[in-house]
């Protein structure tokens, strides 16, 4: 509606790998007073063309999802003739670093550790995604004949993520059998009992 201030959505669902229609949402919001934030944590380094083509005001990314160090990310606000600068207020106050948005010293080593993986992921994403497709195919061949459901829209899903439910089987039992061959968890990374 015309009263909506912000739309925030994930580029890719972190548990199912389903790719969200951010380009369409960005296009629908263009020309409105609504700000558009994209959480590209899961898609950055894999779907960068989608990010280049989306009309967003704000973008969040992180280094550790592309083999960079933990503890560093980026919050990007677009500012040009077609994008209004969002009215973002700092979470902490102090010095005038980062145009007053963030006090303290920038962690240069972490920033440098973010730069190379970002460059490499942009150049090598197609090769990486093809490798993930091959691994996903092998995995699905290995479970062929079992009673399972792939969760999420498989037509619009990252090949690097599989969310699967095995019917009538205890998740912990599966984990014990295949943990040497596959990297997986039986819960989200946010869940304290997760092995992710």
Regions found by a protein language model. Give the residues of each.
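Pyridoxal 5′-phosphate
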Residues: 1-196
């Amino acid at each position: 509606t015309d009263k909506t201030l912000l739309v925030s959505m994930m580029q890719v669902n972190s548990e199912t790998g389903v790719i969200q229609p951010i380009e369409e949402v960005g296009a629908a919001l263009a020309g409105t007073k609504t700000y558009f934030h994209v959480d590209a944590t899961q898609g950055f380094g894999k779907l960068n063309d989608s990010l280049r083509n989306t009309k967003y005001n704000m973008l969040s990314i992180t280094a550790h999802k592309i083999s960079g160090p933990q503890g560093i990310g980026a919050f990007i606000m677009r500012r040009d003739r077609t994008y209004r600068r969002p009215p973002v207020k700092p979470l902490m106050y102090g010095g005038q670093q980062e145009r007053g948005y963030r006090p303290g010293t920038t962690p240069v080593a972490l920033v440098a550790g973010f730069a190379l993986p970002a460059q490499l992921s942009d150049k090598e994403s197609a090769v990486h995604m093809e490798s993930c497709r091959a691994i996903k195919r092998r995995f699905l061949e290995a479970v062929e004949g079992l009673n399972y459901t792939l969760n999420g829209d498989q037509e619009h899903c990252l090949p690097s993520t599989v969310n699967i439910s095995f019917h009538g089987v205890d998740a912990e039992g599966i984990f014990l059998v295949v943990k040497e061959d596959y990297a997986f968890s039986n819960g989200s990374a946010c869940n304290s009992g997760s092995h992710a």
